[in-house]
């Protein structure tokens, strides 16, 4: 593992946190109205992302005292942003935890091996580069024209679990965001026939690791703006990202279309993931339908058999009794 000698935490965030006050020092000019607005919006964006990540960590107890968090860094916008924000939060956190960045070099042709080591050394973050030629394995085993995501993901997952053990990491942080979670929900509904999303925190399938997703509440569009603002040295994925006709790409386009044409719909979908009512679904493993009997006592979650659901009227503000909205989606500054 490489441990740089410098120990600066987050790379200088002055551009993001710049105030809109007059900066007319000697030889400098005041900000124009447009520049003031841009600085203000950039500052709001940064604070919003930090707040959302902090809330997700708190809501799901993602990081605890003494944790060693292995931040999986792919070189994409999401993982860069996750590392950047976690470093920032660590400065203010009431607990102590360590961060180590890990990149899996899958030996894709043209992969710029120098980019991540240089970046991580510059910002003073300990890191480990794991070299494994999964690219050749995937290209050999997956027929031409078929998507490589499934096999690539399985290989990558196994390697990262092993590396986490070798490094003594107690948490594995992945850069999936709100849109990824919703896309997974729709993919499972449309093509898998099940109500299954992507949890903010889970035990790994090998039973040895806890995986966390600190960006769970963050919109992808915000991460795109943030990455551009921070000028992260983005490394494009030419193995899976360029594959045409991916079902996930269809879900992404669908969600963005809904978000544009029906304001609030996507926020409500996301909120629904934390407002599950098993008694009003059809899974007999989640609710004892077979043994259900009339108790003679009123039940606020009971079926209003002959009434229309409040939301059926088109009133998006209606909330079923007992529903627990995710407060983070009620943004006041979006």
UniProtKB/Swiss-Prot annotation:
Required cofactor(s): Mg(2+); [4Fe-4S] cluster
GO CC aspect terms: cytoplasm
Positions that bind [4Fe-4S] cluster: 149, 152, 240
Catalytic activity, EC: 2.8.1.-
Alphabetical UniProt keywords: 4Fe-4S, ATP-binding, Cytoplasm, Iron, Iron-sulfur, Magnesium, Metal-binding, Nucleotide-binding, RNA-binding, Transferase, tRNA processing, tRNA-binding
Reaction equations catalysed: cytidine(32) in tRNA + S-sulfanyl-L-cysteinyl-[cysteine desulfurase] + AH2 + ATP = 2-thiocytidine(32) in tRNA + L-cysteinyl-[cysteine desulfurase] + A + AMP + diphosphate + H(+)
Position of the signal peptide: none
Domain of life: Bacteria
Pathway(s) served: tRNA modification
Subcellular location as annotated: Cytoplasm
Cofactor note: Binds 1 [4Fe-4S] cluster per subunit. The cluster is chelated by three Cys residues, the fourth Fe has a free coordination site that may bind a sulfur atom transferred from the persulfide of IscS.
Gene3D superfamilies reported for this sequence: HUPs
Note: The thiolation reaction likely consists of two steps: a first activation step by ATP to form an adenylated intermediate of the target base of tRNA, and a second nucleophilic substitution step of the sulfur (S) atom supplied by the hydrosulfide attached to the Fe-S cluster.
Similarity annotation: Belongs to the TtcA family.
Role this protein plays: Catalyzes the ATP-dependent 2-thiolation of cytidine in position 32 of tRNA, to form 2-thiocytidine (s(2)C32). The sulfur atoms are provided by the cysteine/cysteine desulfurase (IscS) system.
HAMAP family: TtcA (MF_01850)
Protein name per UniProt: tRNA-cytidine(32) 2-sulfurtransferase
Gene behind this protein: ttcA
